[in-house]
């Protein structure tokens, strides 16, 4: 992903307990992020912490991917916590598209 990153944290059993991504979270990087999330979905532990930080930009394509990932985690009964590092403009963006409460949740 150009100007974006994706990291996984695993436990001793090789199950993913944490995901972190950030940078340019825009359409140009959405296919690679989708690939990473699809691969990660098969190896998630029972609880996962998802940290989204160092966001340079974020657009609706990434929001849609995150919502799809949330739906997948719900389907496979994975508990999750989101940690967001948002500036005021990014918080306003999420509020304006109607997703702020969903993203700041712990399930």
Roles of regions detected by a PLM:
Residues 1-61, 67-107:
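STAS-like cytosolic regulatory interaction modules
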């Amino acid at each position: 992903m150009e100007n974006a990153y994706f990291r996984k944290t695993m436990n001793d059993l090789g199950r993913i307990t944490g995901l972190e991504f950030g940078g340019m979270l825009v359409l140009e990087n959405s296919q690679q992020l989708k690939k990473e999330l699809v691969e990660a979905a098969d190896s998630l532990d029972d609880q996962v912490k998802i940290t989204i930080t160092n966001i340079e930009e974020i657009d609706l394509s990434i929001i849609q991917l995150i919502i799809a990932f949330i739906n997948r985690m719900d389907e496979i009964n994975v508990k999750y916590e989101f940690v967001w590092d948002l500036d005021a403009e990014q918080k306003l963006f999420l509020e304006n598209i109607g997703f702020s409460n969903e993203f700041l949740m712990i399930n």
